[in-house]
Amino acid sequence: MKVKNIKIAIKFTEAFLEEAKSTMKKIMAGEKVSRKKGLYFENLDAMRKALTPKRLELLHTVKEKRPQSVYELAMLMNRDLKNVTQDLAYLERLDLVELKKTRDKRSKTPPSVEYDKILLEIAV
């Protein structure tokens, strides 16, 4: 089984702008540009606000327990349904979790995590 990773990095504004400038030059020159997939934050504080211990626990629980609904996830974690729903919506916007609605009698939204590891990269 192949391990799937997601990259999370801290990239300072200057480095981000320099990389964007370099990419634009390559595009203008007609060169092929490889797509870099990942989640980037400007600083460690921003990353900590996004990936709180509760949200990391939520990702782990989704991956390990594979709940069939948001309600089931909230019960597994002994957390309030509203808070779990808000955290899932936030993590979905960051592309860290996927929510797929089912077409059963009762509409369910099973969350899923499609990677095995989060790799953190911090430039010095």
Each model region followed by its residue ranges:
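General nucleic-acid-binding
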Residues: 1-28
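Short alpha-helical segments that sit at the start of domains
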Residues: 30-57
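Short, cationic-aromatic polyanion-contact patches
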Residues: 47-54, 69, 101-124
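Short amphipathic alpha-helical elements of helix-turn-helix/winged-helix folds
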Residues: 60-65
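A short acidic, leucine-rich amphipathic alpha-helix
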Residues: 72-76, 91
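Glycine-centered, phosphate/nucleic-acid-interacting loop/turn motifs that mediate DNA/RNA or nucleotide
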Residues: 95
